[in-house]
Amino acid sequence: MNSNKKATIVVDAQFGSTGKGLIAGYLAERDQPDVVMTAWSANAGHTYINAEGRKFVHCMLANGIVSPKLTTVLIGPGSQMNAELLRDEILSCADLLQGKTILLHASAALILQKHVEEEAGPMTKIGSTKKGCGAAMIAKIRRNPDDNNTVGANGDYMEEHIYGPVREAGVFIRTATNAEYMAVVYDAERIQVEGAQGFSLGINNGFYPYVTSRECTPAQVAVDVNLPLAFIDKVVACMRTLPIRVANRYNDKGEQIGWSGPCYPDQKELDWEKDLGMEAELTTVTKLPRRIFTFSYEQTKAALEVIRPDEVFLNFCNYLEPDEVAAVIGTIERAAHELKVPGPMPLARYYGYGPTVNDIDLDMRHQ
């Protein structure tokens, strides 16, 4: 049994889309965890592009599967899982997962078609991705024995929709009891946990009701994957030089029918073309244009106050001039100093200048 401090948690300190998938892949290749953990929902995408240009776009499967020492993938009890999506992601990476084990916690929730249909109408008003995640979570919370949507209660469904096809591809996968799941956690040599979405979207720390259906803090991520807090020895928080929110929603006539929510008082919403001279980014899941904002001291301070990261990954540095990036770094350091965040400075240890692992630097570029 290995019970020493051994886990890294990757979280988002803004509104999402900060490059968690990119830094997760980078760290997995560098730190080589044998166990990777997630408890995602199907409403957020995570992208990693390796040094050879292979692209991984996952909503269910950890990007840490690229670890050279990987043995086990754990999907935690706090997940709201789209089984077909997980199946497809596993099959697309079957070459990397040969001889590996994938365990799905029996208490993870399944997103069924009825949950997607339940969110189809009213959730448009708050910019929801409408993937059924909240509805699946609510169904689990209701605890109706006649409507049990946990993985453990739907063995036939899991066998038909995911386990059978995945095993045929040579990847071992099954449902795990809590005891079986925790045995892997305790026996692991090194663990990497990947959070989803972002601090400012948290149901308690965000701009309610323009939020997601749970918190996105390291503590919540640990709870959702059943990771003992004592095992955590590093928290990496991801930020963008220019934070984003998901798109507003419009009908076929071009009329706005949904708003994804406000920003912090010291932020300004920017126009992709007029202010930045570039095409708008599209969201990974909905393929709609993201809203983009200036960097916020208030957002940074609020996030660091709760997250208390050991390191920061500052992404999209290529969107700004070097002096502007330096100003953002200064804002992060000022917030960290005011909050007495421990550890060596600067807090920003990794800098992203593009979409691939080759674009991550350990020093800020000056040209």
Swiss-Prot record:
GO process terms (BP): 'de novo' AMP biosynthetic process; IMP metabolic process
Protein residues bound to Mg(2+): 17, 45, 284
Transmembrane segments: none
Pathways per UniProt: Purine metabolism
EC code(s) of this entry: 6.3.4.25
Chain residues that bind ATP: 17-21, 45-47, 197, 315, 318, 354
InterPro entries attached to this UniProt entry: Adenylosuccinate_synth_dom1, Adenylosuccinate_synthetase, P-loop_NTPase, Phage_PurZ
Recorded catalytic activity of this chain's protein: dGMP + L-aspartate + ATP = (2S)-2-amino-2'-deoxyadenylo-succinate + ADP + phosphate + 2 H(+)
GO molecular function: adenylosuccinate synthase activity; ATP binding; magnesium ion binding
Alphabetical list of Pfam families matching this protein: Adenylsucc_synt (PF00709)
Keywords recorded for this protein, A-Z: ATP-binding, Ligase, Magnesium, Metal-binding, Nucleotide-binding, Purine biosynthesis
Catalytic residues of the enzyme: 17
Co-factor requirement: Mg(2+)
Binding site for dGMP: 17, 43, 128-129, 143, 212
Binding-site residues, L-aspartate: 284-285, 290
Top enzyme category: ligase
Domain of life according to the entry: Viruses
PANTHER family (UniProt xref): ADENYLOSUCCINATE SYNTHETASE (PTHR11846:SF0)
Family as reported in the entry's similarity comment: Belongs to the Caudovirales PurZ family.
Functional summary from the UniProt entry: Involved in the synthesis of the atypical nucleotide dZTP (2-amino-2'-deoxyadenosine-5'-triphosphate). Catalyzes the condensation of aspartate with deoxyguanylate into dSMP (N6-succino-2-amino-2'-deoxyadenylate), which undergoes defumarylation and phosphorylation respectively by host PurB and guanylate/nucleoside diphosphate kinases to give dZTP. dZTP is integrated into the viral genome instead of adenine by the viral DNA polymerase. This Z-base probably completely replaces adenosine and forms a triple bond to the opposite T-base. The resulting non-standard viral DNA is called Z-genome.
Protein name: N6-succino-2-amino-2'-deoxyadenylate synthase
Organism, scientific name: Salmonella phage PMBT28
